[in-house]
Amino acid sequence: GLSRPSKRCIAGGQPCEFHRGYMCCSEHCIIFVCA
């Protein structure tokens, strides 16, 4: 899938700190929304 690791992403549904349009899911930035 389209994901990016993120050390600051913890809670699901939070915007990613440096990937606009991505959401945080399991400490990763996921495009669109959490599955």
Curated annotation (Swiss-Prot):
Top-rank lineage group of the source organism: Eukaryota
Cysteine disulfide links: C9-C25, C16-C29, C24-C34
Coiled-coil spans in chain: none
Tissue distribution: Expressed by the venom duct.
GO cellular component: a single term: extracellular region
Subcellular location: Secreted
GO molecular-function terms, A-Z: ion channel regulator activity; toxin activity
Residues excised as propeptide: 1-8
Signal peptide residues on this chain, from the entry's feature table: none
Keyword annotations: Cleavage on pair of basic residues, Disulfide bond, Ion channel impairing toxin, Knottin, Neurotoxin, Secreted, Toxin
Chief location: secreted
Entry function: Probable neurotoxin with unknown target. Possibly targets ion channels.
UniProt free text on domains: The presence of a 'disulfide through disulfide knot' structurally defines this protein as a knottin.
Record-stated family: Belongs to the conotoxin O1 superfamily.
Protein name (database record): Conotoxin Cal6.1g
